[in-house]
UniProtKB/Swiss-Prot annotation:
Catalyzes the interconversion of 2-phosphoglycerate and 3-phosphoglycerate. This is 2,3-bisphosphoglycerate-dependent phosphoglycerate mutase. The gene is gpmA. It is an enzyme of class 5 (isomerase). Substrate binds at residues 8-15, 21-22, 60, 87-90, 98, 114-115, 183-184. One of its GO terms (biological process) is glycolytic process. Disulfide bonds: none annotated. Pathway: Carbohydrate degradation; glycolysis; pyruvate from D-glyceraldehyde 3-phosphate: step 3/5. SMART domains: PGAM. The active site is at 9 (tele-phosphohistidine intermediate), 87 (proton donor/acceptor). Belongs to the phosphoglycerate mutase family. BPG-dependent PGAM subfamily. Its EC number is 5.4.2.11. The record marks 182 as: Transition state stabilizer.
Length: 247
C-alpha cells in the first residue's frame, strides 16, 4: 500500500477577506501560518514521513510546505514546484470580494463560476496587468499555456499530465509524497482519483490546512481516503468554504 498526502495551503490574506485569488500571489494570513504549523505537527505526530514534496509556484502553497517540513524536520527533502499545481485562474474575478460579486451577479451565477466543471469566469484582457504573461515566473510558458481564465475542466487538463508524467511515477517507485497546492487544483486531482462525476464535483469543498491522506494500491487506485484531525472541526471548515460565494 502506498500513501499520498494532499494539503491545501493555510488560509491566505485574501481567503480571510473572501476575495477571488486564483494566480495572484497572496501570502498566508497569521491564521494560515498557524494552520500550516498545526498540519506539520499533526503529520509528525501521526508518524508520517516524506521522501519528496511538490508545490505550486505561489507563495501561499510554498510557505505552507516550508512550514510543514520545518515542523517535521524534513526541510532537506527534494521539493519540486510547478505552475501546473497552481490554483485555478479566476480571470477577471481575481481580487473581487465573493459576497459583493454574488450581490451583483446572484448566488447562482457565482456558484457556477466557483464550482461548475466547465464554465469559466470572464477572462482577463491580454494587456491587463494581472495577466500571467506579465509575470516573469511564467516566462518559459507558451501563449497557449497561459490562461486568461479557467474552469475546473481546464485545471484538470493542465494538472493531470503532470500527475501522470512526474508525480505518479515517484509514488509507484515507493516514494512517500506530499503535494501542497490549492482548493481547485486539489479538487482536480481528487476528481480524477475518486472518479467523481462532472456534476458531483460541484459539492466537493477542500478546507485550508487540513491534511487529506490517500491510501493507494499498486495501480494508484484509492483504497480509502481520510482527513487527519478533529472531524467536527473539519466539517465546520468544509461548510465555511461552501458558504464563501453567497450574498
Amino acid at each position: 500500500m502506498k500513501k499520498l498526502v494532499l494539503l491545501r495551503h493555510g488560509e491566505s490574506q485574501w481567503n480571510r477577506e473572501n476575495r477571488f485569488t486564483g494566480w495572484v500571489d497572496i501570502d498566508l494570513s497569521e491564521k494560515g501560518r498557524e494552520e500550516a504549523k498545526a498540519a506539520g505537527q499533526l503529520l509528525k505526530d501521526e508518524g508520517f514521513v516524506f521522501d519528496m514534496a511538490y508545490a505550486s509556484v505561489l507563495k501561499r502553497a510554498i510557505r505552507t510546505l516550508w512550514t510543514v517540513l520545518d515542523q517535521m524536520d524534513l526541510m532537506w527533502i527534494p521539493v519540486t514546484k510547478s505552475w501546473r499545481l497552481n490554483e485555478r485562474h479566476y480571470g477577471a474575478l481575481q481580487g473581487l470580494n465573493k459576497t459583493e460579486t454574488a450581490q451583483r451577479h446572484g448566488d447562482e451565477q457565482v456558484l457556477i463560476w466557483r464550482r461548475s466543471y466547465d464554465t469559466p469566469p470572464p477572462a482577463l484582457d491580454a494587456d491587463d496587468e494581472r495577466h500571467p504573461s506579465k509575470d516573469r515566473r511564467y516566462a518559459a510558458l507558451t501563449p497557449e499555456e497561459l490562461p486568461a481564465t479557467e474552469c475546473l475542466k481546464d485545471t484538470v487538463a493542465r494538472f493531470l499530465p503532470y500527475w501522470h508524467e512526474t508525480i505518479a511515477p515517484q509514488i509507484m517507485d515507493g516514494k512517500r509524497v506530499i503535494i501542497t497546492a490549492h482548493g481547485n487544483s486539489l479538487r482536480a486531482l481528487v476528481k480524477y482519483l475518486d472518479n467523481i462525476s462532472d456534476e458531483d464535483i460541484v459539492g466537493l469543498n477542500i478546507p485550508t490546512g487540513i491534511p487529506l491522506v490517500y491510501e493507494l494500491d499498486d495501480d494508484l487506485k484509492p483504497i480509502r481516503s481520510y482527513y487527519l484531525g478533529d472531524q467536527e472541526e473539519l466539517k465546520k471548515a468544509q461548510e465555511a468554504v461552501a458558504k464563501q460565494g453567497k450574498a
